[in-house]
């Protein structure tokens, strides 16, 4: 099956004409509500900062490794392709892809782990929840409101990037543990995002596009960095088969072109599988509206069982060979130290933060959240610069 042009809008797609609106009502003008969400995200300060935030490799390790920004753009491209093939709203899928990592602190998941540990006594830190906080509170550009005043559908999708957060009674589910992330609780006090339901279809598209981009592009970056080699991928169910296809078609092809051909074919296989499986599930569930999608007992947008196994094998390979590689771990251990140092410094001496970040006389919990917001907004480079400003030694992270 080839994923080709757009099909007519499905009845179960989210429709900008029938959006649940914005917290602060606005006239939408010539652009659709979801298109305006995309544009606001692209023009935000947090989006620009993604350029100098780590994906896996710290920003200065090489010009061709992915950053949070290039990863985000790749997720958006995949999300638009899937949404177009399914007859969903491309603008909403793109908006959710563009926003999904806005809350990531510097130094990738190492920075998040360090910040979460620092915030253990103050409600913790979660980058998905922080993305919601960025677009609802921390961006301060508009005259009439804080945040970006995005539509309900976009905010819902950001909050539920990994699925429902509570059961119908409000009890936290899964990774949320016993307590919901602070940013989710804070926003729920002013707007009900129906945390107990699944997200809308476009949000599910953005989430699975994130998985596809992670899997394929981390394989690509790992190969470029020399953390592992093509021959080591032969045993992976899907990747090995695609690699064999490429080698059979072009036996003398140079390695760089082989890698690119394998990666582009992997994306195509993943996307085509998602489209087929989603169409099958939609027919079986007889969904007629985005409400039906949200009320379904399982995600509608998903991999088939076979592809889910193949995708899990890719992740299973990447963990020991890339994410826990000794070189990566050494750098990320040092990066966590930078975050811990900065948090302790600003908690003890909040006057060292810029004037508009200071909260004189604030209670510890509020001050800690302020410090976490400040650090989470830093790029890798700015975090290292700030560390060098206040500490005698700062790691080079190379």
UniProtKB/Swiss-Prot annotation:
CDD domains: HDc. Signal peptide: none annotated. Residues 68-215 form the HD domain. GO terms for molecular function: dGTPase activity. It holds the Pfam family HD. Keywords: Hydrolase. InterPro entries: dGTPase, dGTPase-like, dNTPase_2, HD/PDEase_dom, HD_domain, PHydrolase_assoc_dom. GO terms for biological process: dGTP catabolic process. Gene3D superfamilies: Hypothetical protein af1432. Belongs to the dGTPase family. Type 2 subfamily. This is Deoxyguanosinetriphosphate triphosphohydrolase-like protein. It comes from Azorhizobium caulinodans (strain ATCC 43989 / DSM 5975 / JCM 20966 / LMG 6465 / NBRC 14845 / NCIMB 13405 / ORS 571).
